[in-house]
Amino acid sequence: MKNQTNQPSPAVIMQIGSGFWASKILLAAVNFELFTHLARKESMSAREIKDLLKLNCTDRHLFDFLDALFCFGFLKRDGFLETAQYSNSLDTGTFLDKEKTSYMGGMLEMMNNRLYGFWGNLEEGLKTGLVQNEAKNGGEPIFESLYKDPKLLKGFVNAMTGIQIGNFMALAQKFDFSKYKTFLDVGGSAGILSTMVAKYNSNMSCTTFDLPAVEAMANETIQKFEVSAQVKAVSGDFFTDSFPKADVITMGNILHDWNEENKLMLMQKAYDALPDGGVFIAIESVIDNERKQNVFGLMMSLNMLIETADGFDYTFDDFNKWAKQIGFKSTSSLGLTGPTSAVIAYK
């Protein structure tokens, strides 16, 4: 986002500097489940929304809130102030209605409930190099605490599902799985990627591999999408256990959680579990090699500072270097949706 003129302007500075205002307006609407309520009723007046959500602000401030969502394109509006009827836009009706399988609000819920506050400590994170999440004040590291707290774990799993489901669908359709028979998703969480691969590729036998705490969620996903004949959930620890053998092995938003040493260790374990001709695929917000376009990838990498201290997102050149170091024959990249890509290593 740059000033395209030769004249100085504060516009972009103020747009970014006040960006947390816009962010919090959307996050509050998601937290209120506003878009889900609107999907049920098709349209509502401000008064109906105020009563349903039990809001005690002035009518004027409620109009400000709803009309800001309208200006952002998240709501449609027919009428004005007291006469206005509000309804979902195409995007929010598709992706922020909790009753649709396309719901991606889990990530926004986690941003609102956890990350919004933690990012207030970005300066401290940059100064100290230390995590700024629950572990900051003597708590356990993020993944240890997640898997011990069912409520926190469910929120995290829903967040990861929300941010990746579109990318998983894209990979399942864009990558040529016709040459392969078996598929393993390491750190598979709720099993969405394995489910999508099975749904779009009847030739594939899929395994979602993660800690025992998420096996029930994965089985629930498998049943929901009616792919139990093709997909199974297997419990294991990708740090301490060998990976099950498979023709294609994936990791979705896994490598970026760790430092380079652990990234290489995980890629080596994938290499060892693949046959000759097998494929390893990492799905991430891969940063462009020149580090000047994928700003979301850069922000995601800073989020790793907040959450893990030494995890980081990376470029395709980084991935290519690591893959060759391990022994993969070649690499390629496949764009998915938005800022996310699949980086692929062939054994």
What are these regions (language model features)?
Residues M1-R77, D91, F177-S178, T182-K347:
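Alpha-helical subdomain
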Residues K2-Q4, P10-R40, E48, L52, ...:
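Conserved Class I S-adenosyl-L-methionine-dependent methyltransferase catalytic core
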